[in-house]
Amino acid sequence: MNVSVEYLGDKKFKANTIKSSYTLDCKEITPVEYFATGIIGCTGIDLVMMAEKDGYEVSNYSVKAEIERTDSVPMKFASMHIIFEFDGEFDATKAKRYIGASLESYCTTVNSIRDSVKVSYTIIQNGE
């Protein structure tokens, strides 16, 4: 994988990947917030892909993270609690299996921090 950023001025960067590009607005969102959203976005898409592979649709879906950081610089992540909230016609066992597979195997970003960050999660499926 190769990625790059180009400074555009005014604390904005153009982020480039082989597939696409997008603007990082560090005046509004910190790099740490981009990092955190990348982590939950990675595990979030895994649930959708696994459910679709099994013929299920996921709707009304959001993923949130509550993150605690250390007090001393560089203020690393100490813990991350991820909340998956969605509707889907598959049972709770499948939902837990999909999310567990993502967090323990498939999601590169989560697994890159797993050794140093306590990761936990909650599933809210169909309002329960």
Region roles according to the model:
Residues 42-43:
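Alpha-helical metal-binding/catalytic segments enriched in His/Glu/Asp
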Residues 1-37, 48-128:
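Extended beta-strand/beta-hairpin segments
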